[in-house]
């Protein structure tokens, strides 16, 4: 039986469609001027068998003794199209839609490869929707047994509910992990989309990547020790890798909707590089491309991060990014910036517009681990960052502690480095309450950076 529940949270409304035990939900988020301390963490009872969950497609369960699979790790980059043994999940050949699949994992057993709700190396115009992964190991450890060919981010990561290349629709795919220990950090995606230039595939266009979710509840992810740490590890509701093809500079990723994706993390201890509701890697000037109403929510957790090319914790990033929320509460962030800068932003970088985005940090300590290193890089906290218009963005810091390498807090930034026609930082706001600050901290409501002296509002 399907039930629909709506939660109204102190002038912030989150409409969540839930099927019991889980048909996962598409998140509809409406920004307001109030705080975001009352976001409800989804309490999901994961099924233990396939007959306990409504299934639209196929279902597979692994309890430690079931047969494992050999799967392609890649979501499309032909330079890394290799197979990974001891994997579990579904794979389809080119141009086949696959919707409503369910993966249930109750024991680590010999599982050590990739986990896929569904994957393919070429989707082209069809859909991967409503695929779900449930993992509950009841405190046991899953040990990745990869070789040096272990999957990188560009291959769809370790766990993806849906992973594809050049797909037209990847919606409402979800990963739910509870009471689980991972032997090292690895990427986890609700939906992963790849149009890598090294494969000479066309860019994404007229694509929908919406309503995808990752939920981590009492999860431990240990640091990497067995391979080069520079590979990076990301947890994202949705991830899009779509650079401009090297053979055609005029081809742009456009007409993309990457909205309503989410990450929920509670009572977890994670070593990784980045967390985002919607993580986007694409070139600038990508045409019509929006990333709205995405959410990243971290509660009662410890995140150990920093010194990687993916140094960022945010909600969304796209040329047009509106009404996105990053909320961190009752948590500890341990950030290393010995080599790289780090950013905590509701919107990481918008080529055009960052508007009505919210960043709330409460009852949280941000430790910057390299404070005594004079060459250590800085950490910024920003509501919305754009290269044109940054408007109506808000940062709230409440009862929190900032390390000395946190050197700037900004409601909104408009970076005029590329000298675009409209460089606007308007009506952005920072609210500080009972927050431990230091003498090197810069606080600005609105901030315009140009080749001429900066303008501060």
What are these regions (language model features)?
Residues 2-31:
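Gram-negative bacterial Sec-dependent N-terminal signal peptides
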Residues 34-187, 192-274, 279-380, 385-408, ...:
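Surface-exposed loop/turn motifs in large extracellular/passenger domains
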């Amino acid at each position: 039986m399907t039930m629909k529940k709506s939660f109204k949270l102190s002038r912030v409304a989150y409409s969540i469609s839930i099927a019991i035990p889980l048909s996962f939900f598409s998140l509809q988020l409406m920004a307001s001027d109030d705080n975001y301390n009352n976001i409800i963490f989804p309490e999901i009872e994961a099924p233990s068998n396939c007959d306990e969950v409504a299934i639209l497609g196929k279902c597979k369960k692994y309890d430690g003794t079931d047969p494992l699979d050999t799967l392609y790790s890649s979501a499309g980059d032909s330079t890394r199209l290799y197979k990974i043994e001891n994997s579990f999940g579904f794979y389809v050949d080119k141009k086949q839609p696959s919707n409503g699949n369910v993966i249930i994992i109750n024991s680590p057993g010999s599982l050590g490869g990739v986990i896929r709700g569904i994957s393919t190396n070429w989707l082209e115009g069809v859909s991967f929707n409503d695929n779900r992964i449930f993992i509950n190991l009841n405190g046991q450890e899953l040990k990745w047994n990869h070789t040096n060919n272990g999957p990188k981010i560009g291959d769809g990561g370790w766990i993806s509910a849906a992973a594809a290349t050049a797909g037209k629709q990847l919606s409402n795919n979800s990963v739910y992990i509870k009471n689980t220990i991972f032997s090292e950090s690895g990427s986890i995606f609700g939906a992963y989309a790849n149009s890598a230039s090294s494969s000479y595939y066309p860019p994404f266009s007229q694509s929908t990547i919406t309503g995808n979710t990752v939920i981590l509840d009492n999860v431990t992810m240990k640091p990497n020790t067995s391979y080069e740490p520079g590979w990076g590890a990301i947890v994202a509701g949705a991830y899009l890798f779509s650079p401009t093809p090297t053979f055609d500079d005029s081809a742009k990723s456009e007409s993309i909707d990457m909205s309503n994706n989410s990450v929920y993390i509670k009572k977890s201890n994670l070593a990784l590089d980045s967390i985002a509701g919607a993580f986007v890697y694409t070139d600038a000037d990508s045409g019509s491309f929006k990333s709205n109403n995405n959410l990243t929510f971290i509660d009662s957790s410890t995140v150990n991060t920093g010194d990687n090319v993916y140094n960022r914790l945010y909600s969304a990033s796209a040329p047009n990014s509106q009404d996105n929320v990053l909320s961190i509460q009752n948590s500890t962030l341990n950030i290393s910036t010995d080599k790289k800068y780090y950013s905590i932003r509701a919107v990481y970088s918008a080529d055009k517009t960052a508007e009505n985005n919210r960043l709330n940090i409460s009852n949280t300590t941000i430790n910057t681990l390299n404070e005594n290193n004079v060459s250590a890089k800085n950490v910024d906290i920003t509501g919305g960052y754009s290269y044109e218009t940054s408007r109506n963005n808000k940062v709230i810091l409440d009862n929190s502690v900032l390390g000395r390498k946190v050197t700037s807090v900004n409601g909104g930034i408009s970076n005029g480095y590329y000298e675009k026609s409209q460089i606007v930082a308007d009506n952005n706001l920072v609210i500080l309450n009972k927050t431990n600050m230091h003498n090197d901290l810069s606080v600005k409501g609105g901030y315009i950076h140009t080749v001429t002296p900066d303008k501060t509002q």
